[in-house]
Structures are given as structure tokens and as C-alpha cells.
């Protein structure tokens, strides 16, 4: 098992594996300190008019607002090409298959579409997954102060932007939830969230549980 994490986010025409299409996939690899390695990759995949017309009203509005529908129509990239582009980037930073876990938010949904449409990519990833959404739900139940203090999400519903937000969210939990009791004060939680919002504070060894915040 390697320390790197492979972050993937997908945009689809819906959540039905039987009929909906994968129309965007992005990937970033991070090291053990959640630093992004390389530039990542973001690929918009072509879908025909029938697939786009079959989208529900909410999904259509979401992908129209983000500009994704227009990009999907203009794209000439098919699933096989997109899969190879993502694998090329991942292989640059993760040399051996089945050694780096998949990470993201509600990542099981994304992986289901990857299994269906990009089996070579799925096979390269370790079977383990790190789902930031699970940490969020645990904090909501056990550490509500941390849950309600988390950084605000942009909700762009574009794959690469969503990954950056997921990484930032895990940075936040690392520095507020994964520390020794009693954990950070409300003001310290707010300071961490503000620093991450401004993008000026990268995670590092000093963020570990060996030096818990006081208060």
C-alpha cells in the first residue's frame, strides 16, 4: 500500500447505472500530506443529444449552469480515450497498480460508473476507498462543532473543482477531528476554515495529532 491517494470525481447525466452516461472525469493524486502532485487531468466526454435530452430537470439545470452541457456537445473524446488520459496521469505518480486507494466524496457512486465504463482504470486502483463523506457524517454525529465549522463548498458541480474541495475538506478534518482530546476550540476551528478558504495554509507535519490545539 502506497501513501498516495488517487482522487477522482465524475459528472454524469444521472445516477442510474442502467441508462445514464459518464460525461466528465477528473483526477488528482496527493501525497501523504495531501499535497497535489502534478497538474491533474480533467476530461469532458462526448454524449449524444438523446442522452442529454433524457436528463432530469435538476441535472439539466445544474449542468447547463456549469457550462458542462455545451462542452459535452463539443467534445470529441470517447470513454476509452478519457480512460487512457486519466491512467496516463495516475501512472506518472503511482507506478504500481493496486497500491493507491481511491479518494473522494460519496466515491462509491463514482467508482460504480468507473467499473462500468473504465475497467482498466478501476483495475489500477486499490480496492480500498477513502470517502470524505463518511468523515463528514461521523463529525455530524460526534463532533457537531467541527461539522458546522467546515469550509463552505462552492458546489460548482465540475469534476476538478469538486476534487479540490474534497481535498480541502479532508485537510480541515485532519486538523480539527484527527487530533487528541479535547480537540480544537470553536475559534481555532474557524481559523482553520478561514485559512483553507483563502488557500494560504497548506497541511504539514505540524498539523498532526502530536501537537493538538489547546482550548
Curated annotation (Swiss-Prot):
The active site is at residue 127. Keywords: Cytoplasm, Exonuclease, Hydrolase, Nuclease. Its main location: cytoplasm. Residues 5-170 form the Exonuclease domain. Its EC number is 3.1.15.-. Signal peptide: none annotated. Coiled coil: none annotated. It is found in: Cytoplasm. Residues 196-215 are annotated as: Disordered. InterPro entries: Exonuclease_RNaseT/DNA_pol3 (IPR013520), Oligoribonuclease (IPR022894), RNaseH-like_sf (IPR012337), RNaseH_sf (IPR036397). It comes from the Bacteria. Pfam families: RNase_T (PF00929). One of its GO terms (cellular component) is cytoplasm. Residues 202-215 have a biased composition (Low complexity). It is an enzyme of class 3 (hydrolase). GO terms for molecular function: 3'-5'-RNA exonuclease activity; nucleic acid binding. 3'-to-5' exoribonuclease specific for small oligoribonucleotides. Belongs to the oligoribonuclease family. This is Oligoribonuclease. The lineage of its organism: Bacteria, Bacillati, Actinomycetota, Actinomycetes, Mycobacteriales.
Amino acid at each position: 500500500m502506497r501513501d498516495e491517494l488517487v482522487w477522482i470525481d465524475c459528472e454524469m447525466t444521472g445516477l442510474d447505472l442502467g441508462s445514464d452516461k459518464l460525461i466528465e472525469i477528473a483526477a488528482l493524486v496527493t501525497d501523504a500530506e495531501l499535497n497535489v502532485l502534478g497538474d491533474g487531468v480533467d476530461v469532458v466526454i462526448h454524449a449524444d443529444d438523446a442522452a442529454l435530452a433524457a436528463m432530469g430537470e435538476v441535472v439539466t439545470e445544474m449542468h447547463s449552469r456549469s457550462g458542462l452541457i455545451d462542452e459535452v456537445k463539443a467534445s470529441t473524446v470517447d470513454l476509452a480515450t478519457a480512460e487512457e488520459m486519466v491512467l496516463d496521469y495516475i501512472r506518472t505518480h503511482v507506478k504500481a497498480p493496486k497500491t493507491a486507494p481511491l479518494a473522494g466524496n460519496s466515491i462509491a457512486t463514482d467508482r460504480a460508473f468507473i467499473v462500468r465504463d473504465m475497467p482498466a482504470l478501476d483495475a489500477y486502483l486499490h480496492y480500498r476507498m477513502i470517502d470524505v463523506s463518511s468523515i463528514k457524517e461521523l463529525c455530524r454525529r460526534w463532533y457537531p462543532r467541527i461539522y458546522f465549522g467546515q469550509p463552505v463548498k462552492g458546489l460548482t458541480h465540475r469534476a476538478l473543482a469538486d476534487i479540490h474541495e474534497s481535498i480541502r475538506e479532508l485537510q480541515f478534518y485532519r486538523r480539527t477531528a484527527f487530533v487528541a482530546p479535547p480537540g480544537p476550540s470553536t475559534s481555532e476551528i474557524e481559523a482553520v476554515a478561514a485559512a483553507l478558504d483563502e488557500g494560504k495554509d497548506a497541511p504539514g507535519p505540524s498539523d498532526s495529532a502530536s501537537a493538538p490545539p489547546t482550548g
